[in-house]
Amino acid sequence: MKVGIRAYEPFALGVKCYDASRPNTDYIRRRVPFSEDLFRGKNPGYKEFTLPFPLSPDQLMVEMFDKAYGDDDNFRIEKFELEKVPARSVWAEPDVHRFILFAQDFAVKAGYLPTGVYDSADGDFLIQYLPVIQDEQGNPLVTPARTNRKSGRIQVSQSAFSRYTIPVRLVVLFHERYHFQIPTRLEKPADLHGLRLYLDLGFPRTEAVYATTKIFNSHPESVGVGHRNRVKDIVNFIDNYSGIQNLKMNVQ
């Protein structure tokens, strides 16, 4: 989807795209800034951007509004074009390809599913959907998901996932899968392998950055130097992603 917006003055545009028939099914939530510099060029106040939807519902609702006031008085839509998403070739192991389908189905439905156990038809993948994830003493954990590296079973927090966009849910699920797939307990290899898969599928880079910052910003009291370095590594990987399958990623 290509969108062209003409702003009358500097402001921040809010964009929200969601399934019109289901609750908590946002495919994109985005802030698009229209800064003062934009009004000094040859085409003042005009900006184009693309909203990719490698995964979309039958009825997609698109809302655009002024982030400050919630109205549409400060801009007009000059372009709104639909384009077919090009087919993409994704390099991954056969079980990862099967997991992609399972993860996409769960990510789409997680906003309205009740808690419980959800598994794939072949029984290879299982998600335990919990109100919140707890430690052995019953204390709530801030993590949105965690993986048993021996079985591949994933625990997911409904409290967290119900607030995330569908792409953010996929970033988390792909990350968790690679803890089992590699296998590794280290965050960086799981981060980068999961992100590569997410980006290879054609999902938006912006939502990948949101996934990282949103999760850590939700609990700033737990963010340390290691977390900040992790965010830098992730953002650097996203910025330098070329779409070329790199089988020798430096993730050690």
What spans do the regions from the language model cover?
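Active-site scaffold of zinc-dependent metalloenzymes
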Residues: 128-166, 177-180
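Catalytic Zn2+-binding segment of zinc metalloproteases
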Residues: 159-163, 176-189, 193-205
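Second-shell loop/turn segments in exported
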Residues: 86-95, 159-161, 178-185, 221-223
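Alpha-helical scaffolds flanking conserved acidic
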Residues: 165-171, 210
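Extracytoplasmic/secreted envelope proteins and their assembly/folding machinery
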Residues: 96-104, 174, 187, 191-195, ...
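Surface-exposed patches in mature extracellular/periplasmic domains of secreted proteins
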Residues: 110-123, 182-186, 201-213
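Long, well-structured alpha-helical subdomains associated
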Residues: 203-252
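A metal-dependent hydrolase signature that marks the N-terminal structural subdomain at the beginning
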Residues: 2-132, 251
